[in-house]
Amino acid sequence: RHDPIDTCTLFLLMRTQVAYLGPKGTYAEQAAGALAKLEKLSEPEFIPYSSLMTVVEHLANKDCEAAVVPIENSVEGGVTATLDSLWTFQDIFIKRALILPIRHALISSGHTHEISEVLSHPQALGQCSQWLRENLPNAIQLPTNSTSEAVRMVKGSRFRAAIASKELSSIQGVNTIAFPINDVPGNCTRFVLLSNKEVPNDGSEDIASFAFSL
């Protein structure tokens, strides 16, 4: 005898779980939504994790069916945390790639002249380094796990600011005090959709990446 599965439970079981670097509002979430549409995933369920290593680890352990991670930025180059994760965990395959334009904002409850600390993901700090040198030369730069985490940490503080997207400013209810602040107007990041199932070769042109140690 088998217990019946109700319609709601069956629907949840059929959804494709997609891991990404959260929390909500990050560039990774935007990329995850776009890649899920390109891949034509049916009713994807997006699951945020606190670090890129954790995202790839959950995929490798088959806790989810897909993952979206940033792999390369046009200004800062390869995303080290992603590359290290792909080196650490075996049998991870790239299904699709997407280039997402990146436009950063300075977000704070204070004014620019009050800011003494700037928080963000290391990649975002690097992409705005020249702007920070020219406009906030004395501010201490503090790395966080994600741009969304940075905005949460500065909310309510007049001497702290975060670098993140304007969308996060609206989501978290914190003011945008400067935009755009990225050093390169054409700043963009390549995100990839990862799978723990081997991707069949359909005869189209592929891009191969090689990693080695000395």
Predicted regions and their residues:
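Domain-level signature for soluble enzymes in the chorismate/prephenate branch of the shikimate pathway
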Residues: 5, 11-214
